[in-house]
């Protein structure tokens, strides 16, 4: 616990973050969630797509009971890859109420349609549909699905190659087909949309190319995302039977990249005997083998730009639907890219999501859960641990640095000794101080605490401030290595709550196991009444004053003594 803890520093290797990477469930009760979007209107709402054709709102941690949009009557979700797949809000949604969806129709076609919000801001007008684009296809799979507005204010659309396995129509390489592409259109131009003049094939003079195409050579890029800070585009493309890949397009790109499918699958020749030539193709910045990882379908995510986990800043997060693995990806400093494992989510990752604040989430497709991505402070204190919030709070406030540095551990079940408790108490009193608040005397006050002892200054400061009278009077001793009891903790933390000179009221006999004549009787009753420590048993009520106090309970008591969560 000695020293002021530093925030988690940007890792020398992103893998250094793996012990702290955390998924915390923030919503449940969804049915096959496949995507989400925020409206960018300052409401803080997250709009979640359920594959059958429903959009639900998560607001302030609660799912609203009434859907924002229900178009199940229009959506075909019979195939496992069909359904309502994409949602994007117009950049001026706060003033114009326009949003766009991507879904599959009964005839297997892909539909891009515009809707408007209704009079109730939490409900869309389901009858306001205006179909903008219909893309026919022959198979139920490989539909792409993501919609997003780029930093240029234009709408980007991902489409799969049309399915059937192996791209039988060679749509990925066919510039006369809108399948197997990223498209870019202007929804504020002509009706139903305009083709931006700057699109790479809009003005090439070739009647056999489609002007809507922004990038091609894709198999099933059903998840892509823009980096909200840089404008860079990240495209995760699901592989056939060998490789899963992540592609990168810099914000300054004029478009027109050919990402290789079906000439290539990742960096491999799709047909090994073809001796394919990768010249002119844009190779992935990350890829992984299905057979080597147990993966089957890459799920693209987001570059983290939130504020709650600064060490994740600038890292692209992505995962695999089947294996549940989540990776980070970032430049390696030498012109290449570094990808590293962060966690196994333990569920089918159907999508990632980004809220208005830049925080990132992952969806559990099977169980219908939504999990927020974050970094916990200690590798050995999971979000499910009973004192997780208290331990996180005192670390972030600078009261503790943990019991081990690499990886950072808190050791919540380790019993607190009286030397460590001196640091806890004085930081509770003074805040996140790095050194004892008083200069210790040259001659020790306590016979059992030498000037060379690591906690000498802390224990002397505890004495100077009147927090302790030691563990014995003749000779005066502190017992620094003695394990802390619940009774002793009651004294220390009550004095943080009140003042070092605090004395408790006379005891009234609350506890069956506390004799009224015991030195600590008034202290434990006062600690219980102040909410610093609960009873250890009821019927009859017991306090267990001689039980040892571990570091988790010390964190709990410190938080309560400082007024509870959140800490001031």
Give the positions of each predicted feature.
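Acidic, Gly/Ser/Thr-rich repeat motifs that build Ca2+-stabilized beta-propeller blades
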Residues: 1-166, 223-226, 230-243, 294-336, ...
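Blade/loop signatures of beta-propeller domains
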Residues: 2-22, 63, 121-125, 192-204, ...
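Conserved loop/turn at the beginning of each blade in beta-propeller domains
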Residues: 19, 29-30, 80-81, 139-141, ...
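A detector of repeated loop/turn-to-beta-strand junctions in beta-rich toroidal repeat architectures
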Residues: 52, 109, 169-179, 243, ...
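Beta-propeller blade signature
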Residues: 112-120, 171-187, 249-250
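Conserved blade-ending motifs and adjacent loop-strand segments that build the rim/top face
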Residues: 218, 336-356
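Feature responds to low-complexity, polar/acidic, surface-exposed segments characteristic
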Residues: 376-388, 401-419, 426-458, 469-487, ...
């Amino acid at each position: 616990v000695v020293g002021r803890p530093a925030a988690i520093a940007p890792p020398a290797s992103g893998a250094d973050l793996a012990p702290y990477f955390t998924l915390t469930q923030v919503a449940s009760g969804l049915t096959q969630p496949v995507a989400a979007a925020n409206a960018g209107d300052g409401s803080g709402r997250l709009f979640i797509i359920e594959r059958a054709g429903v959009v639900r709102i998560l607001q302030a941690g609660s799912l609203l009971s009434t859907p924002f949009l229900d178009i199940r009557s229009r959506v075909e979700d019979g195939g496992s890859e069909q359904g309502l797949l994409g949602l994007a809000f117009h950049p001026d949604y706060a003033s114009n109420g326009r949003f766009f969806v991507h879904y599959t129709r009964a005839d297997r076609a892909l539909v891009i349609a515009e809707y408007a919000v209704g009079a109730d801001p939490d409900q869309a007008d389901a009858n306001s549909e205006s179909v903008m684009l219909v893309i026919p296809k022959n198979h139920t799979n490989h539909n792409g699905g993501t919609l997003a507005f780029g930093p240029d204010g234009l709408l980007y659309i991902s489409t799969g190659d049309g399915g059937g396995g192996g791209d039988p129509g060679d749509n990925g390489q066919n510039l006369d087909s809108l399948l197997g592409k990223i498209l870019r259109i202007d929804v504020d131009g002509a009706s139903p949309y305009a083709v931006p003049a700057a699109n790479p094939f809009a003005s090439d003079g070739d009647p056999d190319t489609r002007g809507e195409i922004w990038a091609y050579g894709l198999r099933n890029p059903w998840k892509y995302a823009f980096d909200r800070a840089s404008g860079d585009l990240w495209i995760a493309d699901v592989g056939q039977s060998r490789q899963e890949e992540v592609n990168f397009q810099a914000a300054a790109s004029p478009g027109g990249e050919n990402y290789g499918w079906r000439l290539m699958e990742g960096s491999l020749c799709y047909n090994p005997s073809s001796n394919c030539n990768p010249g002119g193709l844009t190779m992935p910045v990350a890829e992984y083998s299905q057979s080597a990882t147990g993966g089957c379908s890459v799920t693209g995510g987001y570059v983290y730009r939130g504020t709650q986990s600064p060490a994740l800043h600038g890292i692209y997060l992505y995962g695999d639907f089947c294996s549940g693995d989540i990776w980070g990806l970032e430049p390696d400093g030498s012109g290449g890219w570094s990808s590293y494992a962060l966690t196994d989510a333990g569920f089918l990752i159907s999508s990632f999501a980004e809220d208005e604040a830049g925080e990132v989430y992952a969806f559990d497709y099977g169980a219908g859960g939504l999990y927020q991505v974050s970094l916990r402070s200690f590798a050995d204190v999971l979000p499910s641990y009973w004192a997780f919030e208290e331990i996180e709070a005192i670390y972030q406030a600078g009261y503790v640095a943990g019991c081990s540095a690499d990886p950072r551990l808190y050791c919540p079940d380790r019993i607190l000794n009286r030397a460590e408790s001196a640091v806890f108490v004085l930081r509770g009193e003074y805040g996140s101080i790095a050194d004892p608040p008083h200069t210790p005397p040259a001659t020790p006050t306590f016979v059992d605490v030498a000037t060379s002892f690591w906690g000498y200054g802390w224990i002397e400061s505890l004495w100077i401030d009147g927090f302790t009278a030691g563990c014995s009077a003749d000779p005066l001793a502190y017992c620094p290595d003695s394990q802390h009891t619940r009774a002793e903790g009651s004294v220390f933390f009550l004095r943080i709550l009140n003042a070092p000179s605090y004395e408790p009221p006379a005891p009234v006999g609350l506890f069956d196991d506390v004799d009224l004549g015991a030195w600590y009787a008034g202290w434990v009753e006062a600690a219980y009444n102040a909410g610093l420590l609960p009873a250890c048993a009821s019927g009859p009520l017991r306090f267990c004053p001689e039980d040892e106090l571990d570091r988790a309970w010390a964190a709990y008591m410190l938080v309560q003594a400082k007024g509870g969560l959140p800490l001031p």
